[in-house]
Amino acid sequence: MELLKPLSDFFKAIENDYRISITHIGIYVALLQFRAGQGFVNPIQAYRYEIMDLAKIASPKTYYKCMRELNEYGYIIYKSTRKRNQGSTIFFVDQ
């Protein structure tokens, strides 16, 4: 059950947050899945296309918008790198 705690905490945190859409949820869950594949490290380093594939999102514009909003709303800390050879850094915030 401990593996589900970050997801459960996220759903509790967004319960009354009208700003969060299904796309935000999909991206956050994809980030958690990616993190699990990396050994639950915090922060993770990920390329946009890796998270977009997991979240089933086709538009980079949608991805960047939702990542920026998740950062602004305090659910993650997103440090974007515009370098092609380095993934962005994403910190998970304890809810």
Residue map of PLM features:
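Winged helix-turn-helix DNA-binding recognition segment
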Residues: 35-93
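Short recognition helix of helix-turn-helix/winged-helix DNA-binding domains
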Residues: 1-54
